[in-house]
From Swiss-Prot:
Signal sequence range: none
UniProt-annotated stretches for the region Disordered: 126-154
DNA-binding region: 33-57, 85-108
Compartment(s) where it occurs, according to its Swiss-Prot or TrEMBL record: Nucleus
Gene3D superfamilies linked: Homeodomain-like
Annotated source species: Actinidia chinensis var. chinensis (Chinese soft-hair kiwi)
InterPro entries named in the record: Homeodomain-like_sf (IPR009057), Myb_dom (IPR017930), Myb_TF_plants (IPR015495), SANT/Myb (IPR001005)
Name of this protein: Transcription factor MYB1
Sorted UniProt keywords: Activator, DNA-binding, Nucleus, Repeat, Transcription, Transcription regulation
One Gene Ontology cellular component: nucleus
Lineage: Eukaryota, Viridiplantae, Streptophyta, Embryophyta, Tracheophyta
HTH myb-type domain location: 1-57, 58-112
Tissues in which the protein is found: Expressed in stems and leaves. Expressed at low levels in ovaries.
GO terms of biological process kind: positive regulation of anthocyanin biosynthetic process; positive regulation of DNA-templated transcription
PROSITE patterns: HTH_MYB (PS51294)
């Protein structure tokens, strides 16, 4: 086996080798490629015999130009199967895997197909804080300001207002300088007070006179 392996012929096939391979396939059929070199008398490996038959010697091979339907089918099958040329060629009657691969590399890969590129993952931008500065806390929404308590001046002013209100109903008004100016109602009050004092004075005078007369009488006795 080692001597046979070392003596395997490589390179281009001759016409005589092609005839021997055709006769072997016509007699035994396709398959069992490991027996083809012995049955045909060829000094070739089984892979070389299989590729030579499928790509060049098979009688139903189509050597014409690829049609638009075939090109469209190749593109769709390549999206599904990738570079599995034997499977793609099996869907195209009369086309070999070698012809499909060559047509793809020559016409379609560079002109029609653009492989999608992986989208780069966007990097999260980091905020650079200069040295010596501290991160400021987030600004929270300010609550409405609370009313401040009244000052002492305001309290005194309000006390004065409550203690000495303006009495419009009885005719008393505060003047600009703080003094009170009187209206007729104050005059009436004053006259009433004067009459009251005069009456009291007369009463006390009568009592005094009565006391005097009484002492006089007592003195006379």
């Amino acid at each position: 086996m080692e001597s046979v392996t070392l003596g395997v012929r490589k390179g281009a096939w001759t016409e005589e080798e092609d005839k021997l391979l055709k006769k072997c396939i016509e007699k035994y059929g396709e398959g069992k490629w490991h027996q083809v070199p012995l049955r045909s008398g060829l000094n070739r490996c089984r892979k070389s015999c299989r590729m030579r038959w499928l790509n060049y010697l098979r009688p139903n091979i189509n050597r014409g130009n690829f049609t638009a339907d075939e090109v469209d089918l190749i593109i769709r099958l390549h999206k599904l199967l990738g570079n599995r040329w034997s499977l793609i060629a099996g869907r195209l009657p009369g086309r070999t895997s070698n012809d499909v691969k060559n047509y793809w590399n020559t016409h379609l890969q560079k002109k029609l197909i653009t492989y999608p590129r992986a989208q780069p993952i966007p990097k999260t931008q980091k905020t650079i804080v200069p040295k010596g500065t501290e991160a400021q806390p987030r600004a929270h929404p300010k609550s409405p300001p609370r009313p401040s308590p009244p000052s002492n001046n305001e309290i005194l002013w309000w006390d004065n207002k409550t203690v000495s209100p303006q009495i419009d109903n009885i005719g008393i008004h505060w003047s600009i300088d703080g003094s009170i100016f009187e209206e007729p109602i104050l005059g009436n009050l004053q006259s009433a007070g004067d009459s009251f004092l005069q009456q009291n004075q007369s009463d006390w005078s009568d009592i005094f006179l009565e006391d005097v007369n009484l002492w006089d009488l007592l003195g006379d006795d």
